[in-house]
Amino acid sequence: WTFMDGLHQNIKSYTHSGSKPCKMAATGEAPIGISFAYRGAKEKAAGAPLELIFPSEGLGWEMEAAGILKGTKQLAAAQTLMDWAASEKANQLYNEGYAIVAMPGIAKPVAHFPAEPEKLLIKNDFDWAAQNRDSILTEWQKRYEGKAEAK
């Protein structure tokens, strides 16, 4: 929490959108926006006057997932959707919004984004994050909620 306490002193407001801080910096509404790296690269490629800084500690990331609910009444349709979601075509479409996709060899380089981004990812422990989610959110709200934008 030490890092966040220091950062908090320099935060005007916390948004509920991961890309909004970058968009605000791109339009001049804010001098700095802490955001998804991919959004920053896209804004800069579109001409925004941004200087992108990637943390030397590594890039944060999250995992997208899809699945079929046990007992679904439309199993064949659900399986068709999941087959498509794991297809080469779907991975090509994912690359329009993500620098890294699941299928090797599909992702194209993104302008203004680090080369070989997979090597820059921090280690994520999803089990730990899930087990500690409630306590982390409670502590975050106690410390920082006062600067969060309204939902």
Predicted features along the sequence, with ranges:
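Ligand-binding pocket segment of bilobal, Venus flytrap-like solute-binding proteins
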Residues: W1-E57
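A bilobed periplasmic-binding-protein/Venus flytrap-type ligand-binding module shared by bacterial periplasmic
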Residues: E62-Q74, L93-Y94
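Periplasmic-binding protein-like
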Residues: W84-A107
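Soluble non-cytosolic domains of exported or imported proteins
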Residues: H16-S19, T72-A76, E88, D127-D134
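Solvent-exposed loop/turn segments at secondary-structure junctions
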Residues: Y38-A41, E57-G60, K73, S87-E88
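Conserved C-terminal helix/tail region of periplasmic/extracytoplasmic solute-binding proteins
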Residues: K123-K151
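Short helix/strand-capping connector loops at secondary-structure junctions
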Residues: A111-D125
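Solvent-exposed, polar/charged alpha-helical surfaces in well-ordered, non-transmembrane soluble domains
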Residues: T2-D5, K23, T27, Q79-D83, ...
